[in-house]
Amino acid sequence: MSKYRLKVGAARKDVTPLPSMFPFKQADLNGDGQYTYARQAIHLRAVILDNGVKRFLFLVSETECGNLHYIKKYAMEKYGITEDYISFSNTHSHSCPLKAVYDPGTTLEEMNREVKMGEFGPESPVQQNEWDYGKYCFEQSIAAIDDAVANLKPARFGHAEGKSYINISRDELLPNGQYAFGTNPERPSDKTLSVLKFVDENGSMIAGIINYAVHSTMGFRVKDKDGNMAAYGDLAGEIANFVEEAYAIRGEETVVAWTIAAGANQTPVHSFFHTYHPDGSWEPDERYNHYLGGYMWKLSAHMAARQGNDALKVFDSISKLKENIRIDVAERYLKLPATKVTNWGLPQLFDDREIDDSKMHNVDVPNQFVYIGLKLIKIGDLPVFCYEGEMMVEIGMRLKEAAPLKNLVIVTCYQPAVDRDLHDRFHGSHYYVDKWGFENHTPSYGRNPVKDAITEEKVTEAMFDMFDEILNPDI
């Protein structure tokens, strides 16, 4: 048998909250909003690559699942997957329950004894339904890994890029010169649609991975005609479902995972419907306790179908597939100095009109650091760069241009499954702005935690170092 002969297995599991678990609290922005039901199934997907030398696990979820440290430990102990050959990520859907908290090493009561600090102060205690949902997601993650291993079969691998036009920059420039969340066709936007395709010996697709830079924010402020909010996988989930259903119609049962690229400041093209007045005043579409109607769900389905068809074209364009695939991995953990933006908090989050650029500036936070996990995976000739957190599209496009290998795929919202005592890495939703965003106070500036916006510089250095480790292992 040839060295590095590839086998691939995949599985999809339903992680929709059970009816008894509702209601769930929604985002702080939504005030009293709660999810009271699910309008579509929420999924997680596992894809395992085995080339006879190493196994690699991709676990992609439409919600943040369970305790990744214990999921990693399970995959390592039962299936011999080494720690660095495991990648967890989420699609960054804004329409799933905020908390899926579960730790098999403790109890709910013990977890709540310690008050955790969030971005805007102490976090609320974990509720029983959040714990139960976390346990369910944890169990489904384990089941997905088990099934993916059981489904391993000889495979071939190919990849390609295309274009999709459902995203736009959300750094909107207002008439008063201030930037706010909105839409801006003049700012950079990466239309690249990358796909990874794994087929069996008969040419049927075992699994696919889609990568694109856009937020799944279509449904998180929607109330139906009865005034209820619904959980679902949002835009990312609808795209994955569309492609899987298309292959099912062809007679191919496949698993398709959608991943978010460098899309921190990329919004769906049909989103943000601000109200502008002739006197120059305006009302932001996204503000506290302001809800939209079910038409947002229709727009989401429309864009999902558009990108679903785009993805099918790219998948179908792949004619060169290889069966002998080497897999190499390098990891880094960055420790960067922290900063805090003054005059930024919940009032500014709740209403962009409360932002006063003249009063916002950075102050150092002594002895505090921001940790960013990075992973570079080389699958055959394809580099995949995993990044913890949200990456601005400008940074992503420059990384692609600079990378030593072509067709760099950037997977953000990557979640390193490090031990809890290493550091507290889930203490807020952060945007790592570039120098331009830092200097111009784009909407993401207020939530940038890294001093002097040095993230891009340090990530670029680390990426080159990781490429060097993989491409020149004997030096």
Model-based region annotation:
Residues 1-255, 259-302, 308, 315, ...:
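Conserved beta-alpha junction segments in alpha/beta enzyme cores
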